[in-house]
Amino acid sequence: ADIQARHGQNAVAVYQGNPSVHNYGLMTHSNYFLGLLKTRNRFSATSVDQLPHHLTSHLMYGHGLLIPIPDIDHTDFMLILGGNPLASNGSIMTVPDVEKRLKAIQKRGGKLVVVDPRRSETAAIADQHVFVRPGEDAALLCGLLNTLFDEDLTRASHLPVSDLDAVRSAIAGFTAEAMSARCGVPAATIRQLARDFASADKAVCYGRMG
């Protein structure tokens, strides 16, 4: 109240993280509290974690809500980029007892790979933890895509796709070797990760901010 009295109502900001949507009390009553603050500055994980998925889904599938949800109970290869569901309980893929479900992938012969600059709780139980240089996730992804095209590992004949050749052309110069220098992941690791993902029967890539 003192800050707002001296600097105006909008001098106070509110940030709501992912756990907010896992708490019924916050979901049903937080708006009353926020209304009392009378600030227009409301922030959440949505701007960095959620909205990019909606935009991508709109561009790829025609609607912002057509976001693919990982089938954690049936996949045999799960690649997690930046996500830490053991701490956040997942986002989009919110499931009870997520640790048990991730370990079930391993028990049925599958593989869990986590890409994260730090050894998160989820990375600690993964079959493979790939340390990536902070801020260089895009370089790693470009290296993976380049390998998929370079080694003819794409299988899109059963899907209605468009402009795949444009993607292939755009990614042509982003070799695993070139991207390794950017992201800090060895080129051999990038290539093997792409091969493992492509060769799995039911692979899924899950990317979040936490």
Locate the predicted segments by residue:
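Cofactor-pocket helix-loop regions in the catalytic cores of large enzyme subunits
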Residues: 1-210
